[in-house]
Amino acid sequence: MDIGSIRHDFTEHPPLLEQDLAADPIEQFAAWFQYAVDSGISEPNGFVLATVAADGQPSQRSVLLKLFDEEGFVFYTNYSSQKAEEIEKNAQVSMSFPWYALQRQIHVYGRAEKIPREQSLAYFLTRPQGSQIGAWASPQSKIIESRDFLMLKWQNMKAKFHEGKIPLPDFWGGYRVRPHKIEFWQGQPSRLHDRFLYEKTENGWTVSRRAP
């Protein structure tokens, strides 16, 4: 199928200038993230996480951001999943927030590290009960024989934990991505898009405009 005729011009925003940007990329991320939330787009905290296997093969998946601050970006997962196994071998990852409806993207490059278990527990206890049970029931990234197998395991776990709080699995928790580069992209007419790259140095952050 030839889809070369599918195209869309970008006219949503005025040109982005360096003086419009915050000196700190986390502050700039917060401003754009709030704009995304206020715009009403679906799951503005959704991003694409890229990891690399030991053989050099990259893989990607959609993940939900659950916290960000000056220390970085936090997400949660099964520590036996493909993404976690790849992070254990190569902690360098990238995160992309593809806000197509807003004609904006943010790309984060950094190193992933496990967060303290008590922090994972605090978040786990805020999850809906079904999601807590799901964390126990799903052997994430492993081969399973059918959906019925998964649903039966979920029902068994629900019965097991029918009394009291559901404990945090030993194999489940969070990662924090500590960024060393963050790029902000904003669409402009004639494909003359705005791109600014923040890079971390010993003295803080530098920012430079990059050609689209």
Curated annotation (Swiss-Prot):
- What's in the keyword line of the UniProt record? Flavoprotein, FMN, Oxidoreductase, Pyridoxine biosynthesis
Name the SUPFAM superfamilies for this protein: FMN-binding split barrel (SSF50475)
Query: What is its EC class?
Result: oxidoreductase
Q: What EC number(s) has UniProt assigned to this enzyme? A: 1.4.3.5
Q: Give the binding site residues for substrate.
A: 66, 123, 127, 131, 191-193
A single GO BP? pyridoxine biosynthetic process
Pfam families, alphabetically? PNP_phzG_C, PNPOx_N
Q: Which reaction does it catalyse?
A: pyridoxamine 5'-phosphate + O2 + H2O = pyridoxal 5'-phosphate + H2O2 + NH4(+); pyridoxine 5'-phosphate + O2 = pyridoxal 5'-phosphate + H2O2
Identify the cofactor(s).
FMN
Q: Does the keyword RNA-binding apply?
A: no
Which HAMAP family does its entry note? PdxH
Q: What is this protein called?
A: Pyridoxine/pyridoxamine 5'-phosphate oxidase
- According to its UniProt entry, this protein's organism is Dichelobacter nodosus (strain VCS1703A)
